[in-house]
Curated annotation (Swiss-Prot):
<keyword id="KW-0325">Glycoprotein</keyword>
<dbReference type="GO" id="GO:0005764">
    <property type="term" value="C:lysosome"/>
</dbReference>
<dbReference type="GO" id="GO:0004522">
    <property type="term" value="F:ribonuclease A activity"/>
</dbReference>
<feature type="glycosylation site" description="N-linked (GlcNAc...) asparagine; partial">
    <location>
        <position position="4"/>
    </location>
</feature>
<protein>
    <recommendedName>
        <fullName>Ribonuclease PL1</fullName>
        <ecNumber>4.6.1.18</ecNumber>
    </recommendedName>
</protein>
<keyword id="KW-0540">Nuclease</keyword>
<dbReference type="GO" id="GO:0016829">
    <property type="term" value="F:lyase activity"/>
</dbReference>
<feature type="active site" description="Proton acceptor">
    <location>
        <position position="15"/>
    </location>
</feature>
<comment type="similarity">
    <text>Belongs to the pancreatic ribonuclease family.</text>
</comment>
<keyword id="KW-0456">Lyase</keyword>
<keyword id="KW-0378">Hydrolase</keyword>
<keyword id="KW-0255">Endonuclease</keyword>
<keyword id="KW-0458">Lysosome</keyword>
<dbReference type="InterPro" id="IPR036816">
    <property type="entry name" value="RNaseA-like_dom_sf"/>
</dbReference>
Length: 34
């Protein structure tokens, strides 16, 4: 976690702008439901 962010801010950023790995997991999850 960057020292200039609070845990809550970092948590929010991670959900607004997921890392590529998280995005890939999310896409795989969506694809599984389609």
């Amino acid at each position: 976690i960057p020292k200039n962010l609070t845990r809550a801010q970092w948590f929010t950023i991670q959900h607004i702008q997921p890392s590529p790995l998280q995005x890939n997991k999310a896409m795989n999850g969506v694809n599984x439901y389609t």
